[in-house]
Amino acid sequence: MNRLPLRARVLSECFRSKSLDPVAVVEHSLAQIESHKHLNAFVRVSSEKALEQAKQSKDRHDANSPKSILDGVTIAVKDNFCTKGIHTTCASRMLQNFIPTYDATVVERLQAHGAVIVGKTNLDQFGMGSGCIDSIFGPTRNNWSEDTNDDRFRIAGGSSGGSAVAVAAGLCYAALGSDTGGSTRNPASYCGIVGLKPTYGLVSRHGLIPLVNSMDVPGIMTRTVDDCASMLNAVAGPDVYDSTTVKRPFESIAPLEKQMSLKGVRIGIPIEYHCDGLEKEVLETWTVIADMLESAGATVKAVSLPNTASSIFVYSILNQCEVASNMSRYDGIEYGHRSQEDSSTEQLYARTRAEGFNGVVKNRILSGNYFLLRENYDKYFQKALKVRRLIADDFVRAFKEVDVLLTPTTLSEAPLYKDFVQSNNRDQCAVQDFCTQPANMAGIPAISIPIRLSSRQLPISLQLMGDHFTERNLLQVANWIEKQVDFVANYS
């Protein structure tokens, strides 16, 4: 077979029946990664470690004692999560030679469940982008592209584009992404897979190299909602190494209902998401699914999130302020890239950062430092914090009326690379993250699910958002939609 067509749950059953074994699956995955190198999804492949983990998994299955449903399942990890003994670069020259001495908590937990880590995936440098094009390893190509040569390919979305393509192209079963303003859901939408941003604090950020501490969340990328639930079960829960995780234990999500009743489920349609730039086919898809939900017994009603128009500006200000703070640790002295020009401490510091960061990162640092100047602090940063609270309050009011919000994930299908690069990074993110970043501002869970193909044969996806810690309900509704549209069976 050229792809990995099975769900993790079905794969686990195959392992149990001995019709497949983990070593064969990992060997197939490694072969697929090699044959799809032109997509540039992976920046590093951990073949030896993966085969070693696969052999251990096979031994457990042979003894009928697998660790979990994920035992032997191939997983990719975005290259901003620390992996012990494996380079973690954030796709930046600044960390090009960084080899962590520990695993991120989410990586550690997946391996504790028997998952096999096959490699690290591409991203925009330090996660700053929405196209997966600003990387020292070059851009990632969307596997749905009509043409993957030169600059005629479709972008994968970002910043977790490598993880999205790895799953969509069948190179692995699932992948870790990170989500600060849509970096898991945006590429999931463009690549036709499922992308979950959990509630802030539900999944540990320990070992995730920070971009925006108050919004960063580890994301989950899979081909089906059921696999997404299995991944969440493995990684969610409190962590002593991350003080922002909630202290209560995570209640595992049981296998999702195949025939869920929508009676009594209240679906909200935010009127502000019907915005400029929303493509006709995306709007039509949104309408069709809303009608489908209503026909199945759900109550569908319009709701208002009045501060949505301000959200992208507030997100941009807060993002750049936290970036300026987080990037200040890279000075060429403690770790990371070190310039050869070290005639003085100031010269070393300046040259290290000039050489180590790309233009996008430097621009965000510059903007963030400007907003944080004493004369600008109240005018920009403090005001942005106040509006962020208003945005969060919009969601609080909305979830008193409805259980789930249904919106587009992105305003369009995946753009062509040659068109995408005509805009600067800030303008790109303002368009690509319009529908996704409000969930990060409010800290609520959101999931992108593929619905159908456009007239250009490219994926169109929709997003569901729920109140804090309602992942179970969110996944149930997403699973119901997935069963109706059957994207995997129809288009994969």
Swiss-Prot record:
Keyword field: ATP-binding, Ligase, Mitochondrion, Nucleotide-binding, Protein biosynthesis
Q: What is its main location?
A: mitochondrion
- One Pfam family from the UniProt entry? Amidase
Q: Could you tell me what reaction this enzyme catalyses?
A: L-glutamyl-tRNA(Gln) + L-glutamine + ATP + H2O = L-glutaminyl-tRNA(Gln) + L-glutamate + ADP + phosphate + H(+)
InterPro entries, alphabetically?
A: Amidase, Amidase_dom, AS_sf, GatA
Q: Name one GO cellular component term.
A: glutamyl-tRNA(Gln) amidotransferase complex
Single annotated GO MF? glutaminyl-tRNA synthase (glutamine-hydrolyzing) activity
Please name the top-level EC class of this enzyme: ligase
Active site at which residues? 78 (charge relay system), 159 (charge relay system), 183 (acyl-ester intermediate)
EC number(s) given by UniProt? 6.3.5.7
Q: Where in the cell is it found?
A: Mitochondrion
Biological processes per GO annotation: glutaminyl-tRNAGln biosynthesis via transamidation; mitochondrial translation
Please give the subunit comment from the record.
Subunit of the heterotrimeric GatCAB amidotransferase (AdT) complex, composed of A, B and C subunits.
HAMAP family linked: GatA
Family under the similarity heading: Belongs to the amidase family. GatA subfamily.
Task: Describe the task this protein carries out.
Answer: Allows the formation of correctly charged Gln-tRNA(Gln) through the transamidation of misacylated Glu-tRNA(Gln) in the mitochondria. The reaction takes place in the presence of glutamine and ATP through an activated gamma-phospho-Glu-tRNA(Gln).
- Name used for this protein in its record: Glutamyl-tRNA(Gln) amidotransferase subunit A, mitochondrial
